[in-house]
């Protein structure tokens, strides 16, 4: 800017002199050498101190950094005075006042309680618990002594299973045996609960070519059907009656008496039968399988060993 003013002043002075000295009609050319001096001033501004981002608000410095003014003359500029360093202390590593975020809150749920200690062993070992889908596979109790008559065998293979379902033992009834015999000896396979006035429940079954009432009661009517009743305990009106109806009548708590009879039929007729067979009928009083009463009369197994034949 100083150079521009000087050059302009010289040009104006030259013009005025020409007007005063030059005679009329005389052209005077005056050459002026104009020297333009350009001065470059380099100002070194210190880099600001980098302060790490923290959670505190830094205090203002006691003195702002001094920035030298731009010189107004063409003379050699004076060196800028030294810039006083900022009074903001640089935090030492590891000593920053930065407050870390609070730790996440603990979970609201309480820790799981410790497992209870195992119960002390009792004087008599408890029977093994049955798996959920089938009766226990522990050792079977001893079978009835040989030489037992038909009534004792049929009664045993009812009561051994009833005890596993909290049901009392059945008492043999000659009247129920008599009505069962009449149906069995008819050799006509099918239910009939009207004989001798009725009022009883009934299970029927047959075996082709052999006679084993123990296997019929324990294997076919109890073991095979008890598995199919899993999941129905506590249900007053379970479905799929034809899959487990023999089993539930055998262990029905409200039933107190039973009478059975097995007849040999050379040509068994009726539902799904035929040929030589042994036809077994068991009648029960009071009758079981009453709708709306299953939950109180058919209890889950207690885990006693499985009986097999």
Swiss-Prot record:
Glycosylation sites: 164
Predominant location category: secreted
SUPFAM superfamilies, alphabetized: PR-1-like
PROSITE patterns, sorted: CRISP_1
Keyword Signal: yes
Bias (Low complexity) ranges: 47-59
Transmembrane segments: none
SCP domain segment(s): 154-284
Pro residues: compositionally biased ranges: 61-92, 99-147
Chain spans, region Disordered: 47-152
Keyword Transport: yes
Keywords: Allergen, Glycoprotein, Lipid transport, Lipid-binding, Secreted, Signal, Transport
Entry function: Secreted protein required for efficient export of lipids such as acetylated sterols. Acts in detoxification of hydrophobic compounds.
Name of the protein: Probable pathogenesis-related protein ARB_02861
Organism: Arthroderma benhamiae (strain ATCC MYA-4681 / CBS 112371) (Trichophyton mentagrophytes)
């Amino acid at each position: 800017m100083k150079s521009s003013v000087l050059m302009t002043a010289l040009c104006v002075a030259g013009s005025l002199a020409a007007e005063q000295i030059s005679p009329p009609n005389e052209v005077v050319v005056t050459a002026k050498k104009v020297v333009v001096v350009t001065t470059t001033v380099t100002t070194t501004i210190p880099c600001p101190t980098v302060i790490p981002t923290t959670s505190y608000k830094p205090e203002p410095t006691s003195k702002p950094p001094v920035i030298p003014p731009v010189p107004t003359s063409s003379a050699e500029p004076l060196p800028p005075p030294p810039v006083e360093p900022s009074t903001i202390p640089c935090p030492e590593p590891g000593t920053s006042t930065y407050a870390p975020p609070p730790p996440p809150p603990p979970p609201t749920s309480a820790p799981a309680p410790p497992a209870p200690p195992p119960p002390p062993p009792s004087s008599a070992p408890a029977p093994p618990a049955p798996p959920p889908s089938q009766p226990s596979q522990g050792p079977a109790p001893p079978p009835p002594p040989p030489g037992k008559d038909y009534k004792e065998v049929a009664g045993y293979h009812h009561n051994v299973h009833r005890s596993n379902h909290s049901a009392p033992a059945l008492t043999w009834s000659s009247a129920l045996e008599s009505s069962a015999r009449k149906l069995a000896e008819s050799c006509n396979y099918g239910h009939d609960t009207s004989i001798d006035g009725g009022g009883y429940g009934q299970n029927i079954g047959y075996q082709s070519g052999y006679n084993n009432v123990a296997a019929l009661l324990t294997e076919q009517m109890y073991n095979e059907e008890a598995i199919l009743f899993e999941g129905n305990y506590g249900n007053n009106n379970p479905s799929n009656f034809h899959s487990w109806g023999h089993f539930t009548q055998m262990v029905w708590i409200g039933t107190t008496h039973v009478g059975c009879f097995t007849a040999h039929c050379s040509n068994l007729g009726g539902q799904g039968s035929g040929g030589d067979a042994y036809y077994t009928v068991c009648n029960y009083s009071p009758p079981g399988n009453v709708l709306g009463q299953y939950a109180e009369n058919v209890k889950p197994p207690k885990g006693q060993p499985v009986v097999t034949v």
